[in-house]
UniProtKB/Swiss-Prot annotation:
Belongs to the TPPP family. This is Tubulin polymerization-promoting protein family member 2. Disruption phenotype: Male subfertility with a significantly decreased sperm count and motility. Sperm shows increased irregular mitochondria lacking lamellar cristae, abnormal expression of electron transfer chain molecules, lower ATP levels, decreased mitochondrial membrane potential and increased apoptotic index. Residues 105-117 have a biased composition (Low complexity). It is found in: Cytoplasm, Cytosol; Cell projection, Cilium, Flagellum. SUPFAM superfamilies: EF-hand.
Length: 170
């Protein structure tokens, strides 16, 4: 039972934390775990209770708790959630609520294309000078597409038409 709870603990410890090694959980993820696993019901256990218990079990100047401290916190929350049961039964009840749960991502916004966005981003529909900025595949040409570069090679610095003299005088 504790191993399943430990797996759930690690899944929530890593959630949203790029630098987390999943050995310790932050207060934010601890609250999310309690909310997503229905330990926090809003009546017997509130978000305030969860924050107080987290602060009680963590070290004085620490910001995270490890799995050992997490079990102590769950024991305290279990006694509040399951009144009338002894601490071990309450802990087992909390672990049963945690079984197989993952961090929920409800309400997370996804990118959508609204209205004329596809018209503006489709390079095949470009006209005029903007059309010349992209090749057939839609990839940008870079500086060649933005600026007209002239060929400055010639006999002297002021001569701009290399190879045109012979064509004129024939």
């Amino acid at each position: 039972m504790a191993s399943e709870a430990e797996r759930t603990f690690h899944r929530f410890a890593v959630f949203g934390e790029s630098s987390s090694s999943s050995k310790e959980i932050t207060n934010k993820n601890f609250s999310k775990l309690c909310k997503d696993c229905d330990i926090m019901d809003g009546k017997a256990v509130t978000s305030t209770d969860v924050d107080i218990v987290f602060s009680k079990v963590k070290a004085k100047n620490a910001r995270t708790i490890n799995f050992q401290q997490f079990q102590e916190a769950m024991k305290e929350l279990g006694q509040k959630r399951f009144k009338g049961k002894n601490p071990d039964e309450a802990l087992q009840g909390v672990f049963k609520l945690m079984e197989g749960k993952d961090p929920a991502t409800t309400g997370v916004t996804k990118s959508t294309t609204v209205g004329g966005v596809d018209r503006l981003t489709d390079t095949s529909k470009y006209t005029g000078t903007h059309k010349e900025r992209f090749d057939e595949s839609g990839k940008g040409k870079g500086i060649e597409g933005r600026e007209e570069t002239t060929d400055n090679s010639g006999y002297v610095s002021g001569y701009k038409g290399a190879g045109t003299y012979d064509k004129k005088n024939q």
